[in-house]
A protein has these predicted regions:
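Metal-cofactor-dependent catalytic cores
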Residues: 1-160
Length: 160
């Protein structure tokens, strides 16, 4: 299982631009990304396989177009739950906090891509341990935290 793409943007609701490496900051997120900060969606994940399925349906999309920070290959995000932990590269650790999200309006991503799969297939987390990660680094599940997941408002979030 590996990281296929890392992407960042300066503004929320827009496609992200791929870069080769990035620094994850504990309790903050990805250095230089619009979604960084003291909240539960500091980092977003999407399976590369999901992007490939969107392409097969005729969408003209590539890594970063759905505003995902990290596209992965071989990670089965369909069975992950809030509280799961994910190790990225040699040192970084992210706790999954939310599965999917609500989109209240169609953003630039929807209009550019013709669909947005992040509300259905995106996975979000917060950085527990920082570190520098690179495209091509390994990624793996690393256990579960003590929190429990619940479903609220059409999305699954952490509860304390």
């Amino acid at each position: 299982m590996k990281i296929m793409s890392i992407a960042v943007s300066k503004k929320k609701g827009t496609p992200k631009h791929p870069i080769s490496e990035v620094r994850l900051i504990e309790n903050h997120g990805i250095h230089g990304d619009a979604h960084a900060g003291p909240w539960h969606r500091q980092v977003s994940f999407l399976a590369a396989e999901s992007i490939e399925r969107a392409r097969a349906r005729g969408l003209n999309v590539t890594f970063g177009d759905f505003a995902e920070n990290i596209a992965t290959r071989g990670m089965d995000w369909t069975h992950v739950a809030p509280g799961a932990r994910v190790r990225l590269g040699d040192t970084a650790l992210v706790e999954i906090t939310q599965i999917g999200k609500e989109c209240l309006k169609k953003c630039a991503i929807y209009y550019r891509a013709g669909d947005c799969i992040m509300p259905r297939e995106g996975v979000f987390g917060r950085v527990l341990k920082g570190g520098t990660i690179h495209t091509g680094d390994g990624i793996e599940f690393a256990g579960k935290s003590r929190g429990s997941g619940s479903i609220s408002g059409g999305k699954q979030e952490m509860t304390a």
